[in-house]
């Protein structure tokens, strides 16, 4: 019940009830407003709640680099380091793969294997269209060209209602 109340007051948008809210802390005015990223609704939060007073007394960091980091991230990084200074996982293998990929890309560009000089558009001349129509299978021809195209518009629309 306590968790449901917290979610309803601080996580869900009061307008659209989506959990897309962002709390905006203004220490100068001693207010916290709630802005929904989904519907754009903005409203101030009740200032008599214990959590609101705690947030106002201890505002979050405004440094964007710190904003996404976890509170336990520092503890994890200390635990995951090995005595010789390496972290968990072998990064040298990944570096070798990246270097080989870059080398192959650079080699292809030096050899002229890039797509410069090619035109990537459909030829719309009558001869090219005729050649493409011949390549179509009989079933596809029946779907694209049939006697229904010669009917009046009203008759073609009546096909859907039959």
UniProtKB/Swiss-Prot annotation:
Signal sequence bounds: none
Annotated stretches, region: Disordered: 59-162
GO molecular function annotations of the record: GTP binding; translation initiation factor activity
Statement: the UniProt record of this protein carries the keyword Transcription: no
Biased composition (Polar residues): 85-109
Cross-referenced InterPro entries: IF2/IF5, Transl_init_fac_IF2/IF5_dom, Transl_init_fac_IF2/IF5_Zn-bd
Keywords: GTP-binding, Initiation factor, Nucleotide-binding, Protein biosynthesis
Bias (Basic and acidic residues): 148-162
Function: Catalyzes the hydrolysis of GTP bound to the 40S ribosomal initiation complex (40S.mRNA.Met-tRNA[F].eIF-2.GTP) with the subsequent joining of a 60S ribosomal subunit resulting in the release of eIF-2 and the guanine nucleotide. The subsequent joining of a 60S ribosomal subunit results in the formation of a functional 80S initiation complex (80S.mRNA.Met-tRNA[F]).
Key word GTP-binding present: yes
Protein name per the record: Eukaryotic translation initiation factor 5
């Amino acid at each position: 019940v306590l968790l449901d109340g917290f979610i309803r007051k601080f996580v869900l948008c009061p307008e659209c009830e989506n959990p897309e809210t962002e709390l905006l802390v203004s220490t100068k005015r001693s207010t916290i407003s709630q802005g929904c990223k989904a519907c754009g609704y903005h409203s101030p939060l009740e200032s008599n709640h214990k959590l609101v007073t705690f947030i106002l007394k201890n505002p979050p960091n405004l440094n964007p680099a710190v904003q996404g980091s976890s509170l336990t991230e520092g503890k994890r990084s200390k635990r995951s380091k090995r005595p010789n200074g390496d972290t968990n996982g072998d990064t040298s293998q990944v570096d070798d793969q990246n270097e080989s990929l870059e080398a192959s890309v650079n080699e292809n560009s030096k050899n002229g294997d890039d797509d410069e000089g090619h035109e990537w558009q459909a030829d719309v001349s009558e001869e090219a269209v005729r050649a493409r129509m011949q390549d179509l299978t009989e079933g596809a021809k029946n779907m694209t060209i049939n006697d229904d195209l010669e009917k009046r518009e009203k008759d073609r629309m009546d096909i859907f209602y039959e």
